[in-house]
């Protein structure tokens, strides 16, 4: 295989969700597995809905995932290239002017459906006489431009779906240019894919019906169409769709929870494939395992509980250096991290344990007489991981308590929690003075 060139082409009209992230990830894994290039293209020709803050969010999300790109392009900077391609198509007769209003097209569609006919555009505009066109333009109508499809079967060998085909006669001629002169998705996308040398278009299966017109458009512009891979769309755990505008499963929300990016990459890379879902620590590992023949056509479901399990496994082996920046806790050190790490389900939970160790807490006193007696037996001097065992043995001998009756009241008084990290690691972090005050029932 020659080195592939792929592209991820989001529109900056909303936040990326995990479905978008999966498409971006699989594009990059495929390209890098074969020594190729990954292009990030922002499809921002919709000036009304595209927003710079969404564009920045896309870049931030991809950086967070580690999906660095080899080239960044913005369609809003390439309008001249699209206009030149449109002019070529007009000269060759492959696009034609249409003057129907949206209301007229909708009425025509309803009539077709009422007659049991497919709602395919009937090319009425091609039958307009010059005087009719002049009259419509005198009324102030400005044409939109449709691409004239060849009424033939279009075939391609899809990397995921296998041999695929669609007949041009089953589709309306797609509108390439709006009445205001702005471009819809199809023409800019094909022009960019040609000029950037894209060899493989990897995207969701909601684009399958776009493929036949796009293949014909590649050919009309004198180019060989790239290969296509259409992935089943990712859904939520119960089968609901994901929406970037609603923020459903948005990467922004996931990042805020402290999720490790490789937990998400490990999950998204394997969803819909025959590989078992398991932790991978680097993108290079995922690249080495990537192959199209592992992917099927079943609907993959994104389960946040599965993501959390992967994240917890990664977190429980992560060094302090790996999490320092993500912790966001001033003063936190390796001793603290190693103490709390085994008991965390989410990285954000570490902040609460930092507060327990370093900030004032109202103790929960189950048996004041017992905890005061235990306070009197706290050892002096430097504390380490052996202190807890030595101290509780002394308390046991002095009070006769053992098991839960011994340990539970001490944990409640020292941490205010029923459960948590081992107290042999927490006690040195809490310190002598704070521990004694809490055992005495004082806020400390």
Swiss-Prot record:
Reactions catalysed: tRNA(Glu) + L-glutamate + ATP = L-glutamyl-tRNA(Glu) + AMP + diphosphate
Motif segment ('HIGH' region): 10-20
Pfam families on file: Anticodon_2, tRNA-synt_1c
Record's subcellular location: Cytoplasm
Record motif 'KMSKS' region, residues: 241-245
GO molecular function, one term: glutamate-tRNA ligase activity
tRNA-binding keyword on record: no
InterPro entries referenced in this protein's UniProt entry, alphabetically: aa-tRNA-synth_I_cd-bd, aa-tRNA-synth_I_codon-bd_sub2, aa-tRNA-synth_I_CS, aa_tRNA-synth_I_cd-bd_sf, Glu-tRNA-ligase_bac/mito, Glu/Gln-tRNA-synth, Glu/Gln-tRNA-synth_Ib_cat-dom, GluQ/Sye
Gene3D superfamilies reported for this sequence: 1.10.10.350, HUPs
The EC number(s) this enzyme carries: 6.1.1.17
PANTHER family for the chain: GLUTAMATE--TRNA LIGASE (PTHR43311), GLUTAMATE--TRNA LIGASE, MITOCHONDRIAL-RELATED (PTHR43311:SF2)
Subunit structure: Monomer.
Function: Catalyzes the attachment of glutamate to tRNA(Glu) in a two-step reaction: glutamate is first activated by ATP to form Glu-AMP and then transferred to the acceptor end of tRNA(Glu).
Name this polypeptide is given: Glutamate--tRNA ligase 1
Organism: Paramagnetospirillum magneticum (strain ATCC 700264 / AMB-1)
Gene: gltX1
């Amino acid at each position: 295989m020659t080195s592939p060139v792929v592209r991820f082409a989001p529109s900056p009209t909303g936040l990326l969700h995990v479905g978008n992230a999966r498409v971006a990830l699989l594009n990059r894994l495929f390209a890098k597995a074969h020594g190729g290039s990954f292009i990030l293209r922002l499809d921002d020709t919709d000036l009304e809905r595209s927003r710079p803050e969404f564009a920045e969010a896309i870049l931030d999300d991809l950086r967070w995932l580690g999906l660095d790109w080899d080239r960044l392009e913005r369609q809003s900077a390439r309008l001249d290239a699209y206009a030149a391609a449109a002019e070529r198509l007009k000269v060759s007769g492959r696009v034609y002017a249409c003057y129907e209003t949206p209301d007229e097209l909708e009425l025509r569609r309803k009539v077709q459906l009422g007659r049991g006919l497919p709602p395919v555009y009937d090319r009425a505009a091609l039958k307009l006489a010059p005087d009719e066109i002049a009259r419509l333009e005198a009324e102030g109508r400005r044409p939109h431009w449709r691409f004239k499809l060849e009424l033939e079967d279009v075939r391609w060998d899809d990397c995921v779906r296998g041999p695929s085909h669609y007949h041009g006669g089953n589709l309306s001629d797609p509108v390439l240019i709006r009445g205001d002169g702005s471009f819809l998705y199809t023409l800019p996308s094909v022009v960019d894919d040609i000029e950037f040398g894209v060899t493989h278009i990897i995207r969701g299966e909601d684009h399958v019906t776009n493929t036949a017109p796009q293949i014909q458009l590649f050919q009309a512009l004198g180019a060989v169409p790239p290969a296509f891979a259409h992935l089943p769309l990712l859904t939520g755990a119960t089968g609901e769709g994901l929406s970037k505008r609603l923020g459903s499963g948005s990467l922004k929300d996931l990042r805020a929870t402290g999720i490790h990016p490789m937990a998400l990459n490990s999950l998204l890379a394997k969803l819909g494939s025959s590989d078992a879902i398991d932790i991978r620590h680097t993108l290079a590992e995922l690249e080495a395992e990537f192959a199209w023949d592992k992917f099927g056509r079943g609907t993959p479901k994104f389960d946040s509980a599965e993501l959390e399990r992967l994240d917890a496994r990664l977190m429980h082996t992560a060094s302090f250096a790996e999490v320092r920046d993500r912790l966001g806790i001033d003063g936190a050190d390796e001793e603290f991290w190693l103490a709390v790490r085994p008991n965390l389900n989410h990285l954000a939970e570490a902040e609460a344990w930092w507060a327990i160790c370093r900030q004032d807490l109202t103790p929960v006193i189950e048996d004041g007489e017992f905890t005061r007696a235990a306070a009197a037996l706290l050892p002096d001097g430097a504390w380490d991981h052996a202190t807890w065992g030595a101290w509780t043995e002394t308390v046991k001998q002095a009070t006769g308590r053992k098991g839960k009756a011994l340990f539970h009241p001490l944990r409640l008084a020292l941490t205010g929690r029923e459960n948590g990290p081992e107290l042999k690691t927490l006690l040195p972090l809490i310190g002598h003075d704070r521990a004694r005050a809490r055992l005495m029932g004082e806020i400390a």
